Amino acid sequence: MMTLQMDKTTASSSWERAKSIYDEIAELANKRQKAGNPPDPNLLQLLREKYEAIILESHTFSEQHNIEIPLWQLHYKRIEYFRLHINRVLASSTSTAAQNVKGPSKAEQIAQLKLQFRTFLSEATGFYHDMILKIRSKYGLPLGSFSEDQQSQNLSDKDGKELAEVQKALKSCHRCLIYLGDLARYKGMYAEGDSRSRQYASASSYYLQAASLWPASGNPHHQLAIVASYSRDEFVTTYRYFRSLAVEYPFPTARDNLIVAFDKNRQSYEKLFVPSKDSSKRLTGKGRGKGADISLKDATLVAGPEKDKVTIANEMLKAFSIRFVHLNGILFTRTSLETFFDVLASTSSSLREVISLGSAKELTLGIDTSDSALFIVRVVTMLIFSVHNSKKETEGQSYAEIVQRVEPARNSLTASFELLGLVIEKCVQLGDPSSSYFLPGVLVFVEWLACCPDIALGSDPDDRQTAVRNSFWNQFVVFFNQVLSLGPTFIDDVEDETCFSNMSLYDERETENRLALWEDYELRGFLPLLPAQTILNFSRKHSFGTEGPKEKKARIKRIFAAGKALTSVIKVDQNHVYFDSKKKKFLVGVKPADDFLDSHSSPPKACNALQDNQVMIDHNSPIMQLDQQIYMGEEDDDDEVIVFKPLVTEKRKEASDQIYVPSGGFRKSDQVTTMGDFKALSGSDVAFHENQILQARGNASIQVPASVGANLLGPLQPSTQSQAMHMQQVQTQVQVPASVGANLLGLLLTSTQSQAMHMQQVQTQAVNPQPAQSLAASRLQPIQSQVAQPLPSRVVHFQQTQAQVSHVSPAHSQSTSFGGGSKWSPEEAASLASSLSGFAQLGNGHVMRNEMQGNHGVSYYPAHSLPVHQSYNGNGMGGMPYSQSRTPEAVFPPKIDPVLSSGVVADGLGVQSSLAKKNPISRAFRHLGPPPGFNSVPAKLQKEPAPGSELSGNNHLPVDDYSWLDGYQAQSSRGVGLNSSLNYATSGKPEHLGSTGNGLNGPANFPFPGKQVPTSQVQADFPYFQNPQKDNFVDKNHQSTQLPEQYQGQSTWSSRHFV
């Protein structure tokens, strides 16, 4: 409490001191206005020191009053003063009269002004360097150069309050670096020769440091675009403007500058055509995409003299860049859309020629390998931005504006798949594509698709897009198989593809092993890729262009992980793509036999009871494969955490929208539409329970006097309407007479309409035996009274309570035959009744699972477990059934209730239909369901207590919980009820797996400018003080925003992502 009070006092005193300095600045500003121009240098120096004192004294006060903007304004006004005078001298009259005037010549005046200007810029550069050092010293940051590992280490050592202050300090350093870049850029504008290039390089270095310090800011990329425009590099200029817009805090001026840049590019694009009168007609004529412009190679030959290979490559690369920028300009401005396919054909042809210049080991694209790889990555990034910009949120737009987005969105996808298809095709042609400079770009593209499965799947594609998609995925499969054929070096322990659809499966420990590559650093903060970047570790040092085998192997692994994730949604000529884990090969239209066991270890050995009947079970059946898949990987749960290979139950927890159809693999719940699917499901479940029947033979010896069976089944007569039977079957070392099984199965087989049977199996102990007849009469009296009541919905709740039966004569055991001469033993009859427990019979005789929707809002098939014999436990542990080993409760996901058949053991623990586990103390079971005619309420699973007063002594009837009253529910069961109906949503294309997308639009809004800008316009510079309300970095709404060291938003690759 004392510390908190001291902190408040310190903050208050700092605020007051900053406020006092701010008042002094107001008085000095009035004096400066009265002084006029030129301003007094001493007064400027004093004002600058006052602003700096406020920033260092109270960062909160500084951000609230935007102190950094007027501080930069002091320097910028001085810069404008020198630029204005230099331009005036250059534009002054050159008449003889003016030259004869005594005094310094014009050249001397310009030289003197430039010297003064450079001196001022150098002094201002030193001031901002010193301020960065002071800020870092105050907040305990290292005084050396900025690096990712130092930042991560320092941020991890701070608590909540200190972390917020440090992040504010880093943002101040970020802005100071931008100001330093601007000062260096102005130096380069008035420098000569090599000095100009050095200053521009220095400015770019400052901007890149600022971008790495705060990747979510678009300001550094905007300034880098301005530097690129000085060298007339249209490709890099457009790339940087795109990056400036596709971040969490976009720079608004970039959109206007993009319009100017695209207008200049249009003029460059027109110069590529043959100078003829009909050249403009060929662009929009009938021969769309054919002959619109001359070939790049032909243009080189027409040029005349022979040129070396590098020069030719540079010219071809420049021509492709002009075409490619023009293509993106059409998509961005949505103008001249009728020429899009002509430009796309020209761009595609140009790219094919560019990437055909030698192999990956030679000079490529006219530059070295690392620069070639960077060029391809930027091509991919610009294509991704065009798709992202065309599919951004349409909130607040009119219907006409939304319709206008349809064609650009479709065209951007067509261009992306067509151009990247050429890159993949080139990778296939290489002998060893694992070391190709194309791979970084391929990684960026496939991870983006894995994070956006809706884009990978396609939404209403036209014929042209469908063709280019098929071509791309064909090359995609061939490329992957070619790399796989090189050996297992790159595919051992490939990360699971769930990282692109479920980021919640990853924690901080795992991000340490997710190696960030140079392309990840290059695209850090790029909004469409944030889900894939979320799980990457950016704390290590990196250097562009130098990577070893570790980085190459990591890149291949991530490409394969993305590829495996995409196999669930992509199609090649309407054929699904699968990955065969045994053959290490991607297959088209051929489903591998081990489709459900490709990423799991072999199952543990079964118990002796299971081994006795092992020969009767078909392990190759889909159901047994699914059962084994659920059971696998449980032996080492206590020793390690498996994240990249989660269990099926774990995947249900986070991705419960996928269900398994035995004849069709995994599908969405709304895709199980045909009766064939229901038949396959019914047959698979029946086959599963028949396996249990085989095991029950020889494992159960049960007998109950015939009177018990008569009393039990007396009220149950064949009904002409649906009957829902909830049964709790005793599992004891007693025997049931054949008459019980005969009556029960006769009831099941003679029902003329659907019967929904849900059985819950309880394990009890035989304590204080008593005559069976009195036991049945006392136990079944409440049930008979309930059955005798009116039945509005013809529902019969049948509950066989805890039986304490022993000393039964085996004389009652006899065999029973029924239905067609087939003979059934009592054991088979009892087991078959259990096997049909969780199913309802449809009107056409097909069996389906009942009460499976629960509170999840989705429909899914029940999970199965490997059939394991339950043995009687008499060790005083409360009658808890065990299989091989006792499994703790934590193995069950807390958010879902697996729907299991009665008697089925999941994860080694006997469970009921509803797993509302709350009390770790054992407690006896109690049926909470309502009487006939009321909605079904699932019983809560509560463990039985140790044998005590409840199970000893006299037989106490169950306490009435008043659940039979109309509208009444027990307190413990309210809100837990399951809907008894099972509805399957249908889909027009049941073979498709749906996706919710990843929602990567973020807070950025990109309204379409909708205008053509005259060629006389110039790109806007960076006058921070002229429009402070649009500054994203000093806006008080963003003051509390933390540095996005890791993406705080969602997951798709749904994600995380973020890769």
Curated annotation (Swiss-Prot):
<feature type="region of interest" description="Disordered">
    <location>
        <begin position="806"/>
        <end position="826"/>
    </location>
</feature>
<keyword id="KW-0611">Plant defense</keyword>
<keyword id="KW-0802">TPR repeat</keyword>
<feature type="region of interest" description="Disordered">
    <location>
        <begin position="927"/>
        <end position="955"/>
    </location>
</feature>
<dbReference type="GO" id="GO:0005634">
    <property type="term" value="C:nucleus"/>
</dbReference>
<keyword id="KW-0341">Growth regulation</keyword>
<keyword id="KW-0963">Cytoplasm</keyword>
<feature type="region of interest" description="Disordered">
    <location>
        <begin position="987"/>
        <end position="1015"/>
    </location>
</feature>
<feature type="compositionally biased region" description="Polar residues">
    <location>
        <begin position="806"/>
        <end position="817"/>
    </location>
</feature>
<comment type="subunit">
    <text>Interacts with EXA1.</text>
</comment>
<dbReference type="GO" id="GO:0000932">
    <property type="term" value="C:P-body"/>
</dbReference>
<keyword id="KW-0217">Developmental protein</keyword>
<keyword id="KW-1210">Necrosis</keyword>
<dbReference type="GO" id="GO:0000184">
    <property type="term" value="P:nuclear-transcribed mRNA catabolic process, nonsense-mediated decay"/>
</dbReference>
<dbReference type="Pfam" id="PF10374">
    <property type="entry name" value="EST1"/>
</dbReference>
<dbReference type="Pfam" id="PF10373">
    <property type="entry name" value="EST1_DNA_bind"/>
</dbReference>
<dbReference type="GO" id="GO:0051321">
    <property type="term" value="P:meiotic cell cycle"/>
</dbReference>
<dbReference type="InterPro" id="IPR018834">
    <property type="entry name" value="DNA/RNA-bd_Est1-type"/>
</dbReference>
<feature type="region of interest" description="Disordered">
    <location>
        <begin position="1040"/>
        <end position="1059"/>
    </location>
</feature>
<feature type="repeat" description="TPR 1">
    <location>
        <begin position="149"/>
        <end position="183"/>
    </location>
</feature>
<protein>
    <recommendedName>
        <fullName>Nonsense-mediated mRNA decay factor SMG7</fullName>
    </recommendedName>
</protein>
<dbReference type="GO" id="GO:0090306">
    <property type="term" value="P:meiotic spindle assembly"/>
</dbReference>
<dbReference type="InterPro" id="IPR045153">
    <property type="entry name" value="Est1/Ebs1-like"/>
</dbReference>
<comment type="function">
    <text>Plays multiple roles in growth and development. Involved in nonsense-mediated mRNA decay (NMD). May provide a link to the mRNA degradation machinery to initiate NMD and serve as an adapter for UPF proteins function. Required for meiotic progression through anaphase II of pollen mother cells. May counteract cyclin-dependent kinase (CDK) activity at the end of meiosis. May play a role in plant defense through its involvement in NMD. Together with EXA1, helps to restrict cell death induction during pathogen infection in a salicylic acid- (SA) and reactive oxygen species- (ROS) independent manner.</text>
</comment>
<dbReference type="GO" id="GO:0006952">
    <property type="term" value="P:defense response"/>
</dbReference>
<dbReference type="GO" id="GO:0012501">
    <property type="term" value="P:programmed cell death"/>
</dbReference>
<dbReference type="GO" id="GO:0031347">
    <property type="term" value="P:regulation of defense response"/>
</dbReference>
<keyword id="KW-0677">Repeat</keyword>
<dbReference type="InterPro" id="IPR011990">
    <property type="entry name" value="TPR-like_helical_dom_sf"/>
</dbReference>
<dbReference type="InterPro" id="IPR019458">
    <property type="entry name" value="Est1-like_N"/>
</dbReference>
<feature type="repeat" description="TPR 2">
    <location>
        <begin position="184"/>
        <end position="217"/>
    </location>
</feature>
<keyword id="KW-0866">Nonsense-mediated mRNA decay</keyword>
